C-alpha cells in the first residue's frame, strides 16, 4: 500500500522556521510508503549537487535508498527527493518517532528537517505459526495485538493436558514474540493457545499445532 506521508518545502537560502509539525500515521507493517521532500531554491543562481539524506533512522524503518543527490535545482525553482520505505512489524506502535533529513550543498550550506510519524497498531488479532517448526529444543511464537490486552499463552499435549504457561500478563498493542523451550518434553505434536482480552472485554482465542522432534 503506497502512502504519501507528506510534502516538505525546505529553502536552501532562507532559514527554515521552527513550526509545529503534524504527526503522520503510518500503517502497521506496511510497504510502499513515500516521503516526498521538495527543495526550493529561492536564490537567483542554480544550485548543483544538493544532497538529501535520511539520518539515524530506526532499524525497523527500511529505506530503499537513504540518500538522494539532486543534480541541479534551478534558480527560483524546485526539485523533489522521494524516499520510499517499509515498516517492519517489530516497530513500536502508538508512539511518536522523529525522522531527521539532512540537506547539504557543496558550498557547505546545511539544513535539517524533522518529520514526526506514528506507527498505527495492527488492525486485527493474529497468531503466527511458530518458527522453526518442526523444532528442537526451542521455538518462537509470534502474535499481533490491535489493542493493549491481557495475554495468556499456553502449551497443551495431544491429550489436552497443559504442559506449560508461557505468558500470563499484560501486553501493549503491537507485535510480540515468546520463546518456548521444550527441553524437558517428549517428541510429538503439541497445541499452543493464545487467549487475549482487551480493556473493553473483547476476547480473542487462537490455536495452532506445533511439532517437537528430538
Please name every model-derived segment.
Residues 156-163, 190:
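Short, glycine-anchored, charge-dense loop/turn motifs used at functional sites
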Amino acid at each position: 500500500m503506497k502512502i504519501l506521508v507528506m510534502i516538505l518545502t525546505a529553502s536552501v537560502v532562507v532559514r527554515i522556521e521552527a513550526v509545529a509539525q503534524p504527526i503522520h500515521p503510518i500503517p502497521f507493517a506496511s510497504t510502499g510508503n513515500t516521503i516526498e521532500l521538495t527543495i526550493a531554491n529561492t536564490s537567483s543562481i542554480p544550485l548543483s549537487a544538493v544532497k538529501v539524506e535520511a539520518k539515524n533512522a530506526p532499524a525497523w524503518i527500511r529505506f530503499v535508498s537513504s540518500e538522494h543527490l539532486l543534480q541541479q535545482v534551478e534558480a527560483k525553482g524546485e526539485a523533489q527527493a522521494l524516499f520510499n520505505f517499509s515498516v517492519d512489524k517489530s516497530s513500536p506502535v502508538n508512539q511518536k518517532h522523529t525522522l531527521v533529513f539532512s540537506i547539504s550543498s557543496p558550498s557547505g550550506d546545511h539544513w535539517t528537517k524533522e518529520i514526526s510519524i506514528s506507527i498505527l497498531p495492527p488492525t486485527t488479532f493474529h497468531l503466527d505459526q511458530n518458527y522453526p517448526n518442526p523444532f528442537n529444543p526451542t521455538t518462537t511464537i509470534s502474535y499481533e495485538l490491535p489493542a493493549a490486552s491481557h495475554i495468556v499463552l499456553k502449551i497443551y499435549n495431544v491429550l489436552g493436558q497443559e504442559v506449560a504457561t508461557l505468558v500470563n500478563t499484560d501486553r501493549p498493542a503491537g507485535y510480540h514474540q515468546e520463546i518456548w523451550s521444550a527441553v524437558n518434553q517428549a517428541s510429538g505434536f503439541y497445541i499452543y493457545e493464545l487467549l487475549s482480552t482487551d480493556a473493553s472485554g473483547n476476547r480473542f482465542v487462537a490455536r495452532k499445532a506445533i511439532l517437537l522432534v528430538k
